[in-house]
Amino acid sequence: MTDQWTLNRRNFAGHWQGCGSWFERDGSGRLDLQHPTRRIDPTTYAISFSDDDHGVWDGSGLAFAPGGKATYPISRATYNAGGGCWQFPGAGGQSSRGLDAERPRFGHEINLFCGRSRSMLVLLWEPLDGRWRLQRVGAVGFRCLNSADPEPDSPACGTP
């Protein structure tokens, strides 16, 4: 069986770029999933590995990072230290492991891969009146810029 770190490397290695769309509840509490409240173009994740055990995650166009950018070393030794990451061939993500009323939100990130295309969905819940409510949804359709055979852009919604 392939270990989680190896699946993570196979899924995510690449220079991923796409347009990020964020949907957030308005003042009345309505969550409109057809009209984004924020678009970030481009959203870029450059994920590279220097050897079998080490790499770098470098992101820009990020919704929650200071200045929209972040860079982190990644390694087999520290991968999934919190136990919230999961990988399968062609799918990977991370999830909050529990609800903590002291934290401002919890979430799930789901990535689905097809060839060198990647669809990422981020779901964020926030507390409201003692309950958790889905507050924000982020979606990015990525293409890998490192691909030798780039895939064409997807048609706009509603087109054949």
Predicted regions mapped to residue ranges:
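Soluble ligand-binding/transfer domains with enclosed cavities or grooves
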Residues: 2-160
